[in-house]
Regions:
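N-terminal secretory signal peptides and thylakoid transit peptides that target proteins
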Residues: 3-26
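Residue-identity detector for glutamine
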Residues: 5, 59, 90, 138-143
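Short Fe-S-cluster ligation motifs
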Residues: 137-195
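Residue-level marker of regulatory loop/turn positions in helix-turn-helix DNA-binding domains and
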Residues: 8, 99, 138
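N-terminal pre-ligand scaffold of iron-sulfur
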Residues: 17, 23-24, 34-134, 171, ...
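A general structural-boundary detector
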Residues: 2-3, 98, 133, 162
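C-terminal single-pass membrane-anchor helix
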Residues: 30-31
Length: 195
């Protein structure tokens, strides 16, 4: 018994002749999305803008004498967020130039990618090996690195995202010097985490 010719339906033969369309379309879609994501992560990083501090109660962080050398670090919690205070070698956008040529910057330690904690990575070779990031000759200094997905933030550039999946800079903490002590008096809002 044969089927009538000229039927407009999808026959088994036609289906088998065109089965390849599905995996090709899926592969093209996957590669298209990966290309979009890679370009967004590589070229879509936001620069550091003017500080947008929200006032918060003053909190003593450290004495200036505790930050006696460049890249001295004090970790603290402010506005329910883990943060870090750094003595940096030059003025930083959103940082503080304290008396005696002391330059300070403080950042939230919550990575702007998925919220893991960032830490100060002092050794450029560790950044190159563990984070697959080698800074240029002018940026051979400690960086803030997230070990979850290997994002790197430059404290000298105001916490700007330099490498990895994070596209937004770290929120900055407003600093003040009162006498010989450093205080936090405000913090930038936490960004919506990226994916």
């Amino acid at each position: 018994m044969s089927r009538p010719q000229g039927g407009g339906g999808l026959s088994r033969r036609r289906l088998l002749e065109r089965w390849w369309i599905l995996p090709v379309a899926a592969t093209a879609g996957a590669f298209g999305y990966m290309g979009y994501y890679a370009s967004r992560v590589t070229f879509g990083k936001k620069g550091v803008g003017a500080p947008d501090f929200r006032p918060r109660p003053a909190q003593k962080l450290a004495a200036l004498s505790d930050l006696n050398a460049e890249w001295s670090e004090v970790n603290f919690t402010y506005d329910a967020r883990p943060c870090t205070l750094l003595r940096v070698p030059q003025s930083v956008p959103g940082g503080l130039d304290a008396p005696g040529s002391v330059r300070l910057a403080a950042f939230s330690r919550v990575c702007t990618h998925l919220g893991c904690a960032v830490n100060l990575v002092r050794d450029p070779e560790v950044l190159a090996f563990a984070f697959n990031y080698r800074a240029g000759p002018q940026d051979q200094h400690p960086q803030l690195g997230c070990r979850c997905h290997y994002s790197v933030f430059d404290p000298v550039r105001g916490g700007e995202a330099m490498f990895g999946k994070a596209t937004l800079p770290l929120p900055r903490v407003r600093l003040e010097v009162r006498g010989n002590d450093v205080y936090a008096t405000g913090i930038e809002p936490a960004p919506t985490l990226s994916t």
